[in-house]
């Protein structure tokens, strides 16, 4: 009887593990044919891609642009504030200088997860989510581990699709935040003036974990830090599009 109970428990554990694995889809070949899988929350959809930190599009749900006098209305692409880039010792991290690339779609956690080693100096892991309880918001959580002593810089910029009018950029200092922390907001009218869309973003990190810089000429914000071998640092980028 005891053996039967143990066998049932073992079968149950194996079944639960199999069910959990069924929630996840994994890719490890960055050179294979690729189709992005979006994360969405009913308000916005975010489309990650295979290149490091790449986000191809942000789509606004049920927001349509007038097609003009003789055109057809279509879903409006959103302003994209989720663009990040990483430099290690002043060298840009790109697809050609990374190894161990892996992407995972965790359907249970509603997360798109990417990991890789870059320049033999850092191990990077980041996840992209469209926040469930904030319908116009998304978040990118990033973890960087130093494989050797190095300096890292992360740059955030905002992309305005070409079908928009002239953009306007505003930098707002965060109340109650750390000295020098800002949120960057970019607003622009849609082509035919049907909507005015704003994309905003800001970094979130532990106090004194990074040096923050406001790059108005480049229309961007950045954080940087020197890491010692074996040291791990984490931060997040929060963004909204509405």
Regions found by a protein language model. Name each.
Residues 19-242:
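Beta-sandwich/jelly-roll carbohydrate-recognition scaffolds of carbohydrate-active enzymes
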Residues 3-14:
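Sec-dependent N-terminal signal peptides
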Residues 1, 16-21:
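Basic/polar N-terminal segments that are highly enriched at the extreme N-terminus
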């Amino acid at each position: 009887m005891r053996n039967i109970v143990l066998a049932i428990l073992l079968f149950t554990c194996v079944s639960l593990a199999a069910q959990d694995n069924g929630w996840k889809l994994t890719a490890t070949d960055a050179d294979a044919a690729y189709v992005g899988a979006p994360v969405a929350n009913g308000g916005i959809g975010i489309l990650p891609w295979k290149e490091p930190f790449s986000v191809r599009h942000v789509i606004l749900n049920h927001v349509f642009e007038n097609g003009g006098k003789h055109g057809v209305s279509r879903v409006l692409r959103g302003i994209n504030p989720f663009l990040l880039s990483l430099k290690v010792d002043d060298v840009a991290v790109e697809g050609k200088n990374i190894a161990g690339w892996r992407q995972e779609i965790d359907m249970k956690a509603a997360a798109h997860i990417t990991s890789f080693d870059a320049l033999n100096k850092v191990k990077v892991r980041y996840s992209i989510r469209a926040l469930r309880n904030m319908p116009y918001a998304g978040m990118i959580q990033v973890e960087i581990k130093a494989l050797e002593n190095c300096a890292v810089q992360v740059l955030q910029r905002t992309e305005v699709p070409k079908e928009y009018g002239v953009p306007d950029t505003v930098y707002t200092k965060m109340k109650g935040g750390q000295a020098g922390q800002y949120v960057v907001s970019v607003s622009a009218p849609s082509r035919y003036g049907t909507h005015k869309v704003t994309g905003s973003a800001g970094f979130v990190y532990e106090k004194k974990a990074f040096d923050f810089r406001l790059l108005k000429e480049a229309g961007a914000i950045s954080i940087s830090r020197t890491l010692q071998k074996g040291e791990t640092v984490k931060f997040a980028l929060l963004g909204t599009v509405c």
